[in-house]
Amino acid sequence: MRHDHRPYWMHALWEQFENAWTRHFLEPHFESLGGHAKVVRPWNVEVFGPNVHAGQAIHIVSRKDQPVSFTVWSPSDAPGEIHIGDCCFFAGGIRILAAEKIVIGNAALLAKSVTITDSDWHGLYDRITARPPSAPVIIGDNVWIGAGAFVGKGVTIGDNAVIGARSIVTKDVPANTVVAGAPARPIRTLDPDGPFKTRLEMLGDAEGLDRFMKAAYRDQLKGNS
């Protein structure tokens, strides 16, 4: 689409429909979901398995050809879990797969087609055992993960880190570090006292995400009738 010709009132009605769908059909699949979630095309978001938790003001942008999925391996004796902080953003095509535990901190920014998994899902030799090797993945606050990146089992990523597009992350990333490549390697260190501006600051109050989205669409659709 080259230009969205809808008037703002038409977008507002569509947004109400998306919000209602989120509340009635998507939210019940979460173990817990904070208020003010904003999900674009929520029918393209899949939550499979128990123990998927998300904080306040989560923002998900999905498409038919780029669905977003949160998947938990759930054997009865030791189900996995996913914990997502406040004010996180998930673009289309993202896959989060937990056999044990994945934690994503506040204000995380995940670009399209990112994959995060805490398991290999099969052994190198034993490819049929139902208990795959796994290790928790911990992602800090204000982490930015570029498009198409892969984060594997046992990885810890520190606060404010940046993961370059299409990077393959198999080892820990220190806080305030930019990594890129396959495998990912440090290419820059950020000033921990630098002028960071985070989604948590912008959207931290209860109505922040609603105000941000309404302002953005009013500006985009102004003049349409």
Question: For each of these PLM feature ranges, what is it?
Answer:
Residues 77, 129-139:
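Glycine-rich NAD(P)-binding loop of Rossmann-like domains
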Residues 137, 154-155, 176:
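A short, glycine- and basic residue-enriched loop/turn
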Residues 120-121, 127-129, 189-190:
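Conserved catalytic-core motifs of eukaryotic protein kinase domains, centered on the activation segment
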Residues 1-117, 140-141, 175, 184-225:
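Domain-scale signature associated with acetyltransferase and cell-envelope carbohydrate enzymes
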Residues 93-101, 147-161, 167-171:
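Beta-rich strand-turn-strand
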